[in-house]
């Protein structure tokens, strides 16, 4: 696996990984209806690309030795803004629990001068962030498409 900075040509693959990951990995903690409003399959690629370019965004991809087919496969991605808000962190459904999210998160946490990192973690991601030293600040219900989804505002002091 290699970690590298985001490139615009990654955006479409990231959107696909996001959809598949949400609908498989998060299925144990959210209903199918909630998953459908969280990841609709219709991402505004221009808006996401702009956001990824404005943030510090890392992608993980297979190395030549790891790849199973033609082309490199995206394993995961994450992004953080200059204030220390960790916006997105997703790993391919077939590559969970292999240290990929930790490697991406390490890079993101080091990349910004903020003294504190904050994120809005799903029920599924909460244990991952707790193990990394984050604490729950608030449990909240977020409305998406008329449905409520539980997530957690979490923070970690890094400096």
Language-model features and meaning:
Residues 2-16:
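A short beta-loop-alpha structural element at the N-terminal edge
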Residues 19-46:
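Conserved GNAT-fold acetyl-CoA-binding loop/helix
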Residues 55-76, 81:
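Conserved beta-hairpin
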Residues 55-59, 77, 88, 118, ...:
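Short hydrophobic/aromatic beta-strand element in the GNAT-like acyltransferase core
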Residues 81-94, 152:
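Conserved acetyl-CoA binding element of GNAT-fold acetyltransferases
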Residues 91-93, 97-110:
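Conserved acetyl-CoA-binding loop-helix of GNAT-fold acetyltransferases
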Residues 115, 120-125, 139-159:
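C-terminal "cap" of GNAT-fold acetyltransferases
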Residues 132-140:
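Conserved acetyl-CoA-binding loop of GNAT-fold acetyltransferases
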């Amino acid at each position: 696996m290699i970690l590298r900075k985001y490139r615009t040509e990654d955006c479409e693959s990231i959107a696909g990984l996001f959809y598949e990951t949400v609908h498989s990995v998060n299925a144990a903690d959210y209903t199918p209806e909630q998953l459908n409003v969280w990841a609709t399959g219709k991402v505004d690629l221009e808006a996401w690309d702009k956001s990824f370019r404005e943030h510090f965004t890392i992608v993980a991809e297979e190395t030549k030795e790891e790849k199973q087919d033609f082309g490199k496969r995206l394993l995961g991605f994450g992004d953080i803004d200059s204030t220390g808000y960790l916006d997105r962190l997703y790993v391919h459904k077939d590559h969970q629990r292999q240290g990929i999210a930790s490697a991406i998160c390490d890079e993101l946490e080091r990349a910004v001068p903020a003294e504190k990192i904050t994120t809005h973690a799903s029920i599924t991601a909460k244990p991952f962030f707790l193990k990394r030293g984050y604490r729950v600040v608030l449990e909240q219900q977020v409305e998406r498409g008329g449905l409520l989804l539980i997530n957690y505002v979490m923070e970690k002091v890094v400096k």
